[in-house]
Structure formats: C-alpha cells, structure tokens
Amino acid sequence: MERSDLPAVADLFTRTFRKNNQATDSQLAGYLETVFFSSPLYTPDVGSLVHLNETSTIDSAILAMPVEFIVHGRPVTARVLCAFMAEGKSGAAGAARLARMLRAARQDFCFTDNASPVSADHWVAGGGLVLPVQSLEWHRTFRPAAAVLDMARRRVKLLAKLPLQGLARIADRFVRRSRTSFAAAPHDGVTSAPISLPQLMEQAQVMMERFSVHPVFSKPEFDWLVAAAKLNTALGELQCRSIADAQGKVIGCYLYFGADGRNAVVMNVFCHERQEALVVAQIFADLDNLGYASAQGMAQPFLTQAVLRQRHLVHKHTGYFCLVTRHADLKEAAIGDGFYAGGLASESWSRLLHDF
C-alpha cells in the first residue's frame, strides 16, 4: 500500500465495516496514514497490502503495522494485522491472493488479536495458530449501576446528555454496602503509586525477560506507540502505576486507559514470576479505589489463575488471537508459556475498532 492509496482504502474500510455511514469520515485517511506509515519501524516489507482489480481499483486490502519483538534473543519485526477487507467477487479473489502472501511458510511473524471466526479459519488453513486464552477479555465490575450506564451511553449517544450519573452513584452505594464483594481487596502490605512512562518501560524491560518472545519496546517505537494510542481519546487518559511488595520491592507495573467514573481498559501488565496474585489483586484494588465503574483487559496465560480469583468477573470473546510464523521456536513459545503480546503491542488501542 502507498500513501496515494489511502483515500480509496478509507472508502473501502467504511463500506466494509461502517455500512450505516453515509460517507467516509474526513479524518479517517489521515488516521490511517499516522498508524500505518509513520512508525519508526515502517518499511514496505512489513506494511499494508492492497489488491487492484482489472480496472486498477482497490477491491481488497490488509492493514498492517510493524512491532518489533525479541524471539529467543534475536530481533524480529512482526506485522500486526488490523483490518482485512474485500468488496465484491473480484475483492474476494483479491483477498484470497493477499491471504496466500501471508501464509506461515513466507512470514517471520504476523498476528492479530481481533480476527473473526471466518478469518481465524483462514489463519489456521495457512499454517497459523489460534491462541484461545489471548482470544478472551476479562471484565471486572466494581460499581454495577455506573457500569450499566456507561455501557448504555456508549451504545445510545443521547443518554450521555442526561444527568443519570448521580442516580447511578446512589444505587451503587446501596449495592456495594449490601454486597461487599464488589469491592476489590489488595494483599496485606502491597502498595502502588503512579509512575511516568519512562519508569514503566524501565521496569517492564526487566519483567519481560521471563518470556522468550516479547516486544522490544525500544524508546523510539514505545514513544510512537504511546502517541498513537493517545489519539483514541474515547478511552480516557493513558496512565501507569508501579506495584511494590511489603518490603518495598517493585514486583509489577501496568499501563491503562481510564475515564473518570467509567470503564478502565488495562493495556499491559508486567510482573516478576510468582508475583502474579499480588500484582493482579493490587491492580483491581487500585482501579476500584480510583472510582472506576468497571475494568477490562486481554486475558494472558501467565495471569489467568490470579485473575480468576476475582469476584464479579466474566470473560468475553470479541475476536480471535491468531498468528503465523515460519519459525518453529516462536510457534513453540506461543503454544507454551514463553509468549507475551497484546496491549500496546497489538491493535487494541486503535480507533479503527470502534471509531469512524
């Protein structure tokens, strides 16, 4: 894909995923350029792909952005696939050609965390994997009335103009008084504090060493990912905190989006081995104490047992986490416990998921 293709790709995206829109959002092409062309890692070899039909019209496309990973000590630039779209019969044929280009035998590393069932089948047919745990999101409720109101406001914009927040607060006081399990409790002696983004990265780099496959998050790339993620203002403010045990030793840190009194979206959780239960309990206690109605995040195998200890928590499936690679050691790590991806190292922060 070239920059000159962006207006046509924006129109194709709108016709494919936003069929109720009468016209393409005027900001969409610019956003596509920011996300898919401005990364410090961008090269055409790891960029997006388009297919032209016999009239030289774009009838199918795969949007992709690069994220650098460490795979058993060696750097590998992954393609994060963010949207797969096609239109008409020629588009279906073009999509099949694009999909063949991304078969496992040809790729160092490609993945998505938001594939549809049909797309997931294509990934598997192309030699790829579906990771079942990472295909789930956990959702924890702290204030049920406020959580229901927040969800309703996202679906019915008119509700955002009505003064219903006060009623939700009154209802939640009563509910939390009668059902104390809605409150999240930390472990004794564990504390947390806000930290800067550079501090988060300094701590996370050490904690990611437990995984044989994990993002590099070099300073140029991390700064770019943060700047791109912050464009999604609907998620709230991007914040991070560090967690320490009773002796004051840092055992974990996390990055999240939060909007006052609404939903918190946990992007990334990092921790030392065997500290998962303490870290996860503190995260939920923090978000509860900060007044959020609810919280959500991508399920991760290394955190699953700790997350499942929470009350008023459910797992939801919104899209499949799929990957393809020609490297056997990467595939082995993904199947086992040596793989870390998601959050900033995914498309979960993208405005394309719910905006435009």
Enumerate the language-model features and the residues they cover.
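Residues that line or immediately flank small-molecule/substrate-binding pockets and catalytic motifs
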Residues: 65-66, 83, 88, 114, ...
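Glycine-rich acyl-CoA binding loop
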Residues: 89-102, 276-280, 284
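Short, surface-exposed connector motifs at secondary-structure boundaries
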Residues: 100-106, 289
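Acidic/polar helix N-cap motif
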Residues: 2-5
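Active-site/acyl-donor-binding loops of N-acyltransferases
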Residues: 109-176, 228-230, 238-239, 252-253, ...
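Amide-forming acyltransferase catalytic core, primarily the GNAT-like/NAT-type
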Residues: 7-71, 76, 129-261
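A short, internal acetyl-CoA/4′-phosphopantetheine-binding micro-motif in the GNAT/acyltransferase core
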Residues: 82-92, 268-276
